[in-house]
Amino acid sequence: MLILGTSLANQVHASWQTYIMIIIYFTILLFIGYYGYKQATGNLSEFMLGGRSIGPYVTALSAGASDMSGWMIMGLPGSVYSTGLSAMWITIGLSLGAYVNYFVVAPRLRVYTELAGDAITLPDFFKNRLNDHNNYIKIISGLIIVVFFTLYTHSGFVSGGKLFESAFGLNYHWGLLMVAFIVIFYTFFGGYLAVSITDFFQGVIMLIAMVMVPIVALIDLNGIDTFKQVAEMKPTNMNLFKGTTVLGIISLFAWGLGYFGQPHIIVRFMSIKSHKLLPKARRLGISWMVIGLLGAVAVGLTGIAFISERNIKLEDPETLFIVMSQILFHPLVGGFLLAAILAAIMSTISSQLLVTSSSLTEDFYKLIRGEDKAKAHEKEFLMVGRLSVLIVAIVAIWIAWSPNDTILNLVGNAWAGFGAAFSPLVIFSLYWKGLSRTGALAGMITGALVVIIWIVWIKPLASINELFGMYEIIPGFLASVITTYFVSKYTKKPGSFVTHDLDKVKQIVKE
């Protein structure tokens, strides 16, 4: 257990009713995986993108659930508990980023990916958009996806291991393996359809949980006066601006820049039935996100008073939601709330596994086999896609076996990597006729390298100068934008077909 005190440990330890709820939840996921296998895995496009047949509501909640991960239920409440309301800047940045993403990226990406050779992966879209016959952009972008998503996926497995260790007193490694088995099963067999349906189901569970826990906590404490009590305990607890710096606020706000380049999120826009359904998806998706994030912040704030009043010593702030849900609720409801954490974790892992698998298959294996042969070996590529899910999962499990960082930091590193490498390129690809192959490649590589260099060598110098401690997406994003623009200005453009395609995309989106 991550809670000190034997009497408390006995209160928090999961009962048989909790186990029943978790078993029911796992059974539902396995059934959905089987359903997805029977319905829509006849070819690689169906396995990876659901045949572009997903409705607006599944699109909205699957995008939200795959986006938020265990970070929303474990990482964010833990951060608010530790630092106070100033941690809320990240929720503002993310909400704005997601909202802009639905307007700026979603409609054009849905239309353009189908127009550009029916691309089913982001690297495939970049290749077709820039007429990259040498496949350099496809290979490099595919490599970035594999590297950063393996890092991202392993953060999900860390969350799963922590959950079972904290709530069930189970060994961290056994918990990690249990989560891995279930998520690999329904992703391996059910593909994109199963992942999207499970994400929708899990998104509903997550929302209910993020509303229930803070409301019941307030009832258990002093109602709305609890927030006054939290403010009295420490002045920075209820102040957006205290306990942080201008640079700290900018860094948290900058998380929103990453949305335009997250493959597991924007692939949802590619799979929706029609771009005309995106407004419906946006309204539901943003509402879900804002309510969920505010709930997570409320859990963190009420948790400050809750933990103090009950004299609990919390070793790991990221287990706050687990502790509160197990003490405040009947074991059956507590089991449901633990399932919500699993939902958050597994929805993201499955989406990331699928995107990484599609990149390995579409962007590497097909390339090795050759385009002509690729068309004649659909069943072979479907099997390679499934095996890729397994391989990436095994590597991520191996990395997660010895966790040495917080969930928020792990997610932050991967988020910054994608945001710096892909966000500028996605925007330029959808809006700028002057983008060149060389500019795209240079900007993408520069963004990824700056993020890695900042994490490894610059950030450790934050004690010398605060500027070095800024979130790595900021220098990475700026470096990528500047490099892409100036290199494109002085290198050869793809050709007149780009102008034609961009005009056509613009026209279709307006219809």
From Swiss-Prot:
GO CC annotation: plasma membrane
Q: Which reaction does it catalyse?
A: L-proline(in) + Na(+)(in) = L-proline(out) + Na(+)(out)
Q: Which GO terms describe its molecular function?
A: L-proline transmembrane transporter activity; proline:sodium symporter activity; sodium ion binding
Top-rank taxon of the source lineage equals: Bacteria
Where's it found, cell-wise?
A: Cell membrane
Matching entries from InterPro entries are given as: Na/Glc_symporter_sf, Na/Pro_symporter, Na/solute_symporter, Sodium:Solute_Symporter
User: CDD domains per the record?
Assistant: SLC5sbd_PutP (cd11475)
Task: Name the Gene3D superfamilies for this protein.
Answer: Sodium/glucose cotransporter
What is its membrane topology?
Multi-pass membrane protein
PROSITE patterns from the UniProt entry: NA_SOLUT_SYMP_3
Statement: the UniProt record of this protein carries the keyword Membrane: yes
Q: Name one Pfam family in it.
A: SSF
Membrane spanning stretches: 16-36, 54-74, 85-105, 139-159, 175-195, 204-224, 246-266, 286-306, 327-347, 381-401, 410-430, 438-458, 467-487
**A Gene Ontology BP annotation from the UniProt entry:** proline transport
Tell me if Transmembrane helix is a UniProt keyword of this record. Answer: yes
Q: Which controlled-vocabulary keywords does the entry list?
A: Amino-acid transport, Cell membrane, Ion transport, Membrane, Sodium, Sodium transport, Symport, Transmembrane, Transmembrane helix, Transport
Role according to the record: Catalyzes the sodium-dependent uptake of extracellular L-proline.
Annotated family: Belongs to the sodium:solute symporter (SSF) (TC 2.A.21) family.
Q: What is this protein called?
A: Sodium/proline symporter 2
Source organism of the structure: Staphylococcus saprophyticus subsp. saprophyticus (strain ATCC 15305 / DSM 20229 / NCIMB 8711 / NCTC 7292 / S-41)
